[in-house]
Amino acid sequence: MPWIQLKLNTTGANAEELSDALMEVGSVSITFQDTHDTPVFEPLPGETRLWGDTDVIGLFDAETDMKDVVAILENHPLLGAGFVHKIEQLEDKDWEREWMDNFHPMQFGKRLWICPSWRDVPDPNAVNVMLDPGLAFGTGTHPTTSLCLQWLDGLDLEGKTVIDFGCGSGILAIAALKLGAAKAIGIDIDPQAIQASRDNAQRNGVSDRLELYLPNDQPDIMKADVVVANILAGPLRELAPLISVLPVEGGLLGLSGILASQADSVCEAYTELFTLDPVVEKEEWCRITGRKK
């Protein structure tokens, strides 16, 4: 079906708030671009690159009355009456799949490859995770996902239980299973993420070892040898009491979705119960790991 595209230009600092505003008025998807048209393939809420000049692009159903949409947006404090925007009709495309040509097999660490399900694996003898992210987040293209995958690849997961807190596409949980974990548990607030994780687990032959839960459905008590949470700095701080009880004594914790500038505040929330390793940075993002005391 055809779509209507609404484009706003803003600062990187305001991009997330305006993306929320577009979703509230009916946008079915959001894309972020800098002024040089560099796409963000994995725009997790809060994980946008902080470009100085950012386009926020919303797609709307072709039947949407855009006059009503604009009228509502004019009341937003970051926009105001007569805000600058561009609306255009788009031809019928599969917008959710348009990026597929740019998604190639990627290696993380020594053993692990993440391969799009529509491409051939470059090394059949490697640990290959075949991935189709669908509508969920997590392809390995984002630095935070990459940091988590590299960490998992460096662990001895044989026979271990792993919890993926905020599982998205299931990429981290499935990678852990392919790397030798006996069992993985994925938790996410988004039903689409649960479905994408389930589909990807089936594609990789690990469905029987992956449990998936929405927060309201998860067991009261869960424990794991390894816990990885690639979400956001704010939730990582707020949910520290919940996340901290998940690893067993001596268990490992890996946290990402954190800007390097936010590392100290996140470390502070976990340092009482964990012996933390040096923070690892990639671009402006970082990974925090540690062992349960």
From Swiss-Prot:
Keywords: Cytoplasm, Methyltransferase, S-adenosyl-L-methionine, Transferase. Gene3D superfamilies: Vaccinia Virus protein VP39. It holds the Pfam family PrmA. Coiled coil: none annotated. The keyword Methyltransferase applies. It catalyses: L-lysyl-[protein] + 3 S-adenosyl-L-methionine = N(6),N(6),N(6)-trimethyl-L-lysyl-[protein] + 3 S-adenosyl-L-homocysteine + 3 H(+). The keyword Membrane does not apply. Its EC number is 2.1.1.-. Its main location: cytoplasm. InterPro entries: Ribosomal_L11_MeTrfase_PrmA, Ribosomal_PrmA_MeTrfase, SAM-dependent_MTases_sf. One of its GO terms (biological process) is methylation. It is an enzyme of class 2 (transferase). GO terms for cellular component: cytosol. One of its GO terms (molecular function) is protein-lysine N-methyltransferase activity. S-adenosyl-L-methionine binds at T145, G166, D188, N230. Belongs to the methyltransferase superfamily. PrmA family. Methylates ribosomal protein L11. This is Ribosomal protein L11 methyltransferase. It comes from Enterobacter sp. (strain 638). The gene is prmA.
